[in-house]
C-alpha cells in the first residue's frame, strides 16, 4: 500500500447538507481503507467532533488536494431514484475516479461517551428523566414553502398533551412561533446541544429540515427501538425518494397537485418577502397558495400527523409520561402567546 493521498474537503452549506457530507467521508474510508487521509473545511464544525475519519491537515501542505464538494445529482432528482445521501458520494466518485457506495442509510455523527451517558438536557431541567419528542414548528426564511401553519403544529401538541412532552427547538434568527404546552428551547441550543437532544429523544416531528437528518444519523440509545421515530411534514417541494429515510413517516403530497404532479416543484417561497433575496423571483415562488402558505402543505391535516405519531407509539411500545413526570414538567411548559417571538 502506497502513501495515503491527502484530501481536504470543502463545503460551507447548511448543517443539513453537511450531515450528508459526513456520510460521504465515512464511506470514502469504508470503501477505500487506508488510501486517504481526509480533513474538512466546512461550517458547523460541531458536526465533525469525535469523527474517527478525520486527520488534521494543513491547507498549505503541497501534498494536499483541495476538493470543493457538491451534489449535482440534485439536478436530476425528479428523474433518478437517488437519495440526498448519494449526492456528495456521486460527486467524489466523478472527481476522484472512485466507486464509493453508501454503506449506511444515514449520516455519520459521533457523540462522546460523556454526552451519551449523562442526563439529557431535558432531565437536567425537569430533575428526572422524561420521555420527549423534539418538535420543529417553523423554518428558514429562504424556504418558506416548507412551512406548515403554526396552528396545525399546535393541534398536534394539544392532542398529545399530558401523554407526550414536546420540546420545541429552532434557531433564533429563523421563524419558529411559540407553541403552548411545550418545553421551549428555541434559540437556546448550540448545534452540539441539539445533537444531544436528538440522541436522547424518543422521536422527532419536523418539516424537511436538519432535524430529520439528525434523527437518521444519530445512533439510538441502548434498550430503545432499533431506529429513531421521525414524522416529517413534507408537502410537495422535494421528491420523497430524495429526502425520505426508510424508517421515517414522510408525509408528502407529490403527485396530488398539478404543480408537483411529476415530482417535487423545488420552489423556495410561498410569497415574496421583499428582502432582496433572489428567491423572491417568480421562478422561485409557489404557484398555488392558501392563506400565503403552499397548498401542498395545506393538504396535510393534523390528524394525519397524529396518526403517524400514534402508530410509532403503539408499534414501538413507546412509553408515555407518567403522572409524576407530568406534574414535574407542567410548571416548565410554555404558556405564552403563540405568536411570541423568540427571545
Predicted features along the sequence, with ranges:
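Catalytic machinery of carbohydrate-active enzymes
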Residues: 1-343
Amino acid at each position: 500500500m502506497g502513501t495515503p493521498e491527502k484530501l481536504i474537503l470543502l463545503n460551507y452549506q447548511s448543517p443539513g447538507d453537511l450531515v450528508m457530507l459526513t456520510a460521504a467521508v465515512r464511506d470514502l474510508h469504508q470503501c477505500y481503507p487506508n488510501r486517504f487521509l481526509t480533513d474538512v473545511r466546512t461550517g458547523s464544525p460541531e458536526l465533525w467532533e469525535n469523527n474517527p475519519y478525520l486527520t488534521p491537515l494543513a491547507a498549505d501542505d503541497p501534498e494536499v488536494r483541495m476538493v470543493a464538494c457538491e451534489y449535482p445529482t440534485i439536478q436530476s432528482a425528479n428523474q433518478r431514484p437517488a437519495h440526498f445521501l448519494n449526492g456528495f458520494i456521486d460527486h467524489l466518485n466523478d472527481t476522484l475516479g472512485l466507486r464509493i457506495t453508501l454503506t449506511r442509510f444515514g449520516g455519520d455523527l459521533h457523540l462522546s461517551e460523556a454526552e451519551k451517558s449523562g442526563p439529557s438536557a431535558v432531565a437536567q431541567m425537569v430533575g428526572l428523566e422524561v420521555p420527549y419528542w423534539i418538535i420543529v414548528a417553523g423554518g428558514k426564511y429562504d424556504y418558506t414553502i416548507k412551512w406548515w401553519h403554526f396552528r396545525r403544529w399546535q393541534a398536534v401538541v394539544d392532542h398529545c398533551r399530558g401523554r407526550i412532552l414536546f420540546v420545541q427547538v429552532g434557531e433564533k434568527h429563523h421563524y419558529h412561533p411559540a407553541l403552548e404546552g411545550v418545553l421551549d428551547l428555541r434559540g437556546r441550543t448550540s448545534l452540539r446541544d441539539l445533537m444531544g437532544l436528538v440522541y436522547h429523544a424518543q422521536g422527532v416531528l419536523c418539516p424537511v429540515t436538519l432535524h430529520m437528518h439528525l434523527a437518521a444519523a444519530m445512533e439510538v440509545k441502548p434498550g430503545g427501538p432499533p431506529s429513531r421515530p421521525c414524522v416529517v411534514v413534507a408537502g410537495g417541494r422535494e421528491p420523497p425518494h430524495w429526502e425520505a429515510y426508510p424508517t421515517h413517516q414522510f408525509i408528502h403530497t407529490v403527485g396530488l397537485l398539478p404543480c408537483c404532479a411529476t415530482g417535487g416543484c423545488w420552489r423556495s417561497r410561498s410569497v415574496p418577502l421583499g428582502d432582496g433575496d433572489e428567491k423572491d423571483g417568480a421562478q422561485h415562488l409557489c404557484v398555488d397558495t392558501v392563506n400565503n402558505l403552499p397548498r401542498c402543505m395545506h393538504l396535510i391535516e393534523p390528524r394525519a400527523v397524529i396518526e403517524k405519531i400514534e402508530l410509532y407509539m403503539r408499534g414501538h411500545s413507546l412509553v408515555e409520561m407518567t403522572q409524576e413526570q407530568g406534574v414535574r414538567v407542567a410548571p416548565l411548559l410554555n404558556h405564552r402567546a403563540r405568536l411570541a417571538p423568540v427571545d
